[in-house]
UniProtKB/Swiss-Prot annotation:
Listed name of the protein: DNA-directed RNA polymerase subunit Rpo10
Subunit structure, as described in the record: Part of the RNA polymerase complex.
Enzyme class: transferase
Subcellular location: Cytoplasm
Protein encoded by which gene: rpo10
Length: 62
């Protein structure tokens, strides 16, 4: 689950997650993707760069 907003500045970042993930999985440079998506602040960029999907890891413990 990607956070809806940046923890630091509050900008909406969840709208960029799907395209970022698809393009990164295709092997494109993350810097270029984030630039194309208009994420200029480093706080917003780190929200996508450092995100790890953990929902599937936690499901067995419910």
């Amino acid at each position: 689950m990607i956070p809806v907003r940046c923890f630091t500045c509050g900008k909406v970042v969840s709208t960029a997650w799907k395209e970022f993930k698809e393009r990164r999985d295709a092997g494109e440079d993350p810097k270029r993707i984030l630039d194309d998506l208009g994420l200029e602040r480093y706080c917003c960029r780190r929200m996508l760069l450092t995100h790890k999907e953990t929902v599937e890891d936690l499901n067995p413990y419910q």
